[in-house]
């Protein structure tokens, strides 16, 4: 990301140069960022040398970064082969680490939804809306969806508790029916058609991953040439 690139401009400008020359992949997440940063300690850092040689120098940070950038460009041009070897070593290390990479708990896979599974029943308010929405649209054809919803909400709030019970009881019956239907559905297990779709989706995902691996291998071969 942009912020991560900025954070390594001085302390490890080598990585930015290598990524710009497509010698090292840019990590798309924080976990992957740490993989590369841990390996960055093996790289030479002229910026640190500059600070040691000039401890009392008062320089603006922007000017300091500019100076580091110029120094790295000069070094990279002179010792290109050395940096290419280091980049390949970093890339190999990166790929080894990524093979054992486990996504954070927050990254959940999208669950497969069977279109034939029982649908959740609407709440009392939505049953009320489905009855009165056509009437409001007929009386106010120019109203936007948001305005229609606001009118329905106002009508619901002004409806007497006794009148609301009609919709609440209806919603309760639909909820009980849903509980029975979903229990029966789960007892039977996933239908064959749904299983086939899930298997097909998994195969497609595996095929995409294999194609990406082949592309990475091809890129490595091209770099070696």
Curated annotation (Swiss-Prot):
Region (Disordered): 185-225
Domain of life: Eukaryota
Function, as annotated: Together with PML, this tumor suppressor is a major constituent of the PML bodies, a subnuclear organelle involved in a large number of physiological processes including cell growth, differentiation and apoptosis. Functions as a transcriptional coactivator of ETS1 and ETS2. Under certain conditions, it may also act as a corepressor of ETS1 preventing its binding to DNA. Through the regulation of ETS1 it may play a role in angiogenesis, controlling endothelial cell motility and invasion. Through interaction with the MRN complex it may be involved in the regulation of telomeres lengthening.
Signal peptide region: none
Skewed-composition ranges (Acidic residues): 210-225
One GO-annotated biological process of the protein: regulation of extrinsic apoptotic signaling pathway via death domain receptors
Keyword annotations of the record: Coiled coil, Cytoplasm, DNA-binding, Nucleus, Phosphoprotein, Repeat, Transcription, Transcription regulation, Ubl conjugation
Protein's UniProt name: Nuclear autoantigen Sp-100
Domain spans labelled SAND: 1-25
Entry GO terms, CC: cytoplasm; PML body
UniProt KW Signal keyword: no
Compositionally skewed regions (Basic residues) per UniProt: 194-206
UniProt subcellular location: Nucleus; Nucleus, PML body; Nucleus, Nuclear body; Cytoplasm
Coiled coil: 157-224
SUPFAM superfamilies (UniProt xref): HMG-box, SAND domain-like
Presence of the UniProt keyword Nucleotide-binding in the record: no
Self-association and partners: Homodimer. Interacts with members of the HP1 family of nonhistone chromosomal protein, such as CBX5 and CBX3 via the PxVxL motif. Interacts with ETS1; the interaction is direct and modulates ETS1 transcriptional activity. Interacts with the MRN complex which is composed of two heterodimers RAD50/MRE11 associated with a single NBN; recruits the complex to PML-related bodies. Interacts with HIPK2; positively regulates TP53-dependent transcription. Interacts with CASP8AP2; may negatively regulate CASP8AP2 export from the nucleus to the cytoplasm.
PTM summary: Sumoylated. Sumoylated with SUMO1. Sumoylation depends on a functional nuclear localization signal but is not necessary for nuclear import or nuclear body targeting. Sumoylation may stabilize the interaction with CBX5. Phosphorylated.
Motif (Nuclear localization signal): 66-83
PANTHER family the UniProt entry points to: HIGH MOBILITY GROUP PROTEIN DSP1, PTHR48112:SF18
PROSITE patterns xrefs: HMG_BOX_2, SAND
Organism: Gorilla gorilla gorilla
Disulfide bonds: none
């Amino acid at each position: 990301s942009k912020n991560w690139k900025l954070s390594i401009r001085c302390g490890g400008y080598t990585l930015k140069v290598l990524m710009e020359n497509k010698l090292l992949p840019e990590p798309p997440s924080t976990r992957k960022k740490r993989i590369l940063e841990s390996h960055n300690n093996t790289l030479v850092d002229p910026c640190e040398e500059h600070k040691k040689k000039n401890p009392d120098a008062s320089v603006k940070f922007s000017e300091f970064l500019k100076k580091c950038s110029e120094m790295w460009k000069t070094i990279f041009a002179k010792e290109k082969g050395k940096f290419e070897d280091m980049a390949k070593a970093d890339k190999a290390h990166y790929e080894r680490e990524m093979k054992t990479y486990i996504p954070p708990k927050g990254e959940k896979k999208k669950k497969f939804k069977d279109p034939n599974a029982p649908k959740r029943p609407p709440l009392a308010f939505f049953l009320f809306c489905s009855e009165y929405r056509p009437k409001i649209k007929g009386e106010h054809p120019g109203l936007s969806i948001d305005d229609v919803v606001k009118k329905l909400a106002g009508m619901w709030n002004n409806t007497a508790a006794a009148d609301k019970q009609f919709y609440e009881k209806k919603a309760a019956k639909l909820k009980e029916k849903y509980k029975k239907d979903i229990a029966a559905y789960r007892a039977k297990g996933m239908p064959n058609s749904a299983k086939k779709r899930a298997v097909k989706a998994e195969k497609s995902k595996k095929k995409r991953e294999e194609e990406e691996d082949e592309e990475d291998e091809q890129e490595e071969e091209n770099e070696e040439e």
